[in-house]
Design a protein with these regions (language model features):
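Donor-binding and catalytic core of enzymes assembling or modifying cell-surface/extracellular glycoconjugates
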Residues: 32-121
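A short acidic, often aromatic-flanked loop/helix-cap motif at beta-alpha or helix-coil junctions
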Residues: 4-6, 82-88, 140-147
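Nucleotide-sugar donor-binding patch of glycosyltransferase catalytic domains
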Residues: 106-147
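Short, charged/polar "capping" segments at the starts of alpha-helices
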Residues: 25-26, 55-63, 124-127, 146
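Mid-sequence helix-capping/hinge segment at a functional interface
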Residues: 1-26, 30
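Pocket-edge structural micro-motifs
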Residues: 19, 53, 138-139
Length: 147
């Protein structure tokens, strides 16, 4: 059972991607998130992708702005200044969530939203998000493997 209530709406068709973490050492390559966005857009015709960013994600936001995906009609780049506004937007539209080991992944998982989380420099056995729909991936050499 999700800690913050099961707020997942499987009818939503928006993939949320949070490619930052506040620490470059924890971030999987931005190309991984671009690939996840393209796969979702190609597979789900009426879908959209939101790339979300926090105050510590300026360098990753720059990569997103430079990406050809930023001009795609079904892709939005969003920044959030408060956790409350982020949570409300997430609950309103997220079908699933993809990100690094970060606070936003923990929040999504505790809301019951299916969450794929990538670990690079921290231990997922200690820091894995809690929730019924969490998949953990290790990104330790450019090749991803699921735990």
């Amino acid at each position: 059972q999700p800690w913050l209530g099961d707020r997942w709406n499987p009818g939503n068709e928006t993939r949320w991607i949070h490619p930052g973490s506040g620490s470059p050492e924890k971030n999987a390559p931005f190309a991984l998130f671009e690939r996840r966005a393209r796969e979702w857009l190609d597979r789900t015709p009426n879908s959209s992708v939101v790339f979300s960013f926090g105050e510590a994600d300026e360098s990753v936001l720059s990569l997103a702005r430079a990406s050809e995906l930023s001009a795609h009609s079904r892709v939005r780049l969003k920044t959030f200044e408060t956790l409350g506004s982020f949570k409300n937007a997430l609950v309103e539209s997220a079908s699933n969530f993809v990100g690094n080991d970060s606070g936003p992944c923990h929040l999504a998982s505790m809301l019951g939203i299916p969450t794929d989380v990538f670990f690079r420099s921290t231990n997922p056995m200690v820091w894995k998000p809690l929730g019924p729909r969490v998949r953990v991936y290790l990104d330790d050499s450019g090749a991803n493997r699921i735990l």
